[in-house]
Amino acid sequence: NVRPVFANLAFTQAISPFLMFDYAAPREFSATEEKRGVGPHPHRGFETVTIAFQGEVEHGDSVGHRGVIGPGDVQWMTAASGIVHEEFLSRDFLKQGGVLEMAQLWVNLPASYKMTAPKYQPILSRDIPVVALPENGGTVRVIAGNYAGTQGAASTYSPVMLWDIKLTAGKEVELVVPEGYSAMLFVR
């Protein structure tokens, strides 16, 4: 039940360098031995950013990178000059079953970096800085870029900021987006 939030060329030009955003709403998976996910497929010239909210996703690619991300973790894969990769629900997750919820964002690379070597960054939740919002308004997990002077965990080629924000019910907050940046908000 993955649904595209956006993949429209006119819209993505307005929020460059973002190319596409997919969201897999929470879904219960029964325990199984059967592999579930997406088999080998190629990418080139951009980065895929996968955020696991619930469940576990396993990554493998043609360059030899392997990794598993779980709740709160992020996988930042730079396809750059070209990579073939696959993503499946992790073996442990499949054995026990459970709820999967995740999102994937595609980020265009600047022309000068499109032919660099592929790269893989598994970013664990515990390594993502968290900033408290004023007046107990909530928290900001700084995945990439910065927020309020706190640098995010991901190394990026494009000047992007990716924040995972949890707001406190009934509170009002103001988020400052630097001049020259576009902003997009996704509520789940």
Over which residues does each language-model region extend?
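Glycine- and acidic-residue-biased ligand/ion/polar-headgroup-sensing regions
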Residues: R44-G64, G70-V74, A80-V84, A169-K171, ...
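Long amphipathic alpha-helical segments that form oligomerization/scaffold cores
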Residues: V107-V140
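Conserved double-stranded beta-helix
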Residues: P17-A24, D73-V84, A111
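Generic beta-strand structural signal
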Residues: E47, G67, D73-Q75, H85, ...
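Ligand-binding loop in jelly-roll beta-barrel domains
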Residues: A79-Y113
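"Short basic amphipathic alpha-helical interaction patches in structured regions
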Residues: V63-G70, L89-D92, K119-P122
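Short, structured patches in soluble enzyme cores that scaffold and shape functional sites
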Residues: Q104-A111, L124, V142-N146, K166-A169, ...
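A short glycine-rich, His/Asp/Glu-containing loop-to-beta-strand
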Residues: N1-F53, V131-E174
